[in-house]
Amino acid sequence: MARIAGINIPPHQHAEIGLTAIYGIGRTTARKICEAAGIAYSKKIKELTDGDLEKIRDQLTSLTLEGDLRRETTMNIKRLMDIGCYRGFRHRRGLPMRGQRTRTNARTRKGPRKGAAALKK
């Protein structure tokens, strides 16, 4: 099993799909990494040589991934909340922040429905 950026990549997957197991890498980025490293993205992870894995690791050094990316995202949201802007306020209240309606829908952000009895109190 290949280990890249501290993540075990499933060996049976193609290189393009396997790289998406790393937080911060999607299909497009994975494909660009494979092209830059000179690896066919249809090649399975278990078929990659140590040299191929090193080429992939070299490509990943320029990207913000995993814990650093999660930390950066969290800090950006915290900054919005600290400055008291509209988006920060909506984050704090757990509501959608991009103008969607909330009278109905928005259940993903708001969570499960509260019963009518809970609203009357």
Swiss-Prot record:
The keyword Ribosomal protein applies. One of its GO terms (cellular component) is small ribosomal subunit. GO terms for molecular function: rRNA binding; structural constituent of ribosome; tRNA binding. GO terms for biological process: translation. Keywords: Ribonucleoprotein, Ribosomal protein, RNA-binding, rRNA-binding, tRNA-binding. It comes from the Bacteria. Residues 94-121 are annotated as: Disordered. Belongs to the universal ribosomal protein uS13 family. Located at the top of the head of the 30S subunit, it contacts several helices of the 16S rRNA. In the 70S ribosome it contacts the 23S rRNA (bridge B1a) and protein L5 of the 50S subunit (bridge B1b), connecting the 2 subunits; these bridges are implicated in subunit movement. Contacts the tRNAs in the A and P-sites. Part of the 30S ribosomal subunit. Forms a loose heterodimer with protein S19. Forms two bridges to the 50S subunit in the 70S ribosome. This is Small ribosomal subunit protein uS13. It comes from Delftia acidovorans (strain DSM 14801 / SPH-1). The lineage of its organism: Bacteria, Pseudomonadati, Pseudomonadota, Betaproteobacteria, Burkholderiales.
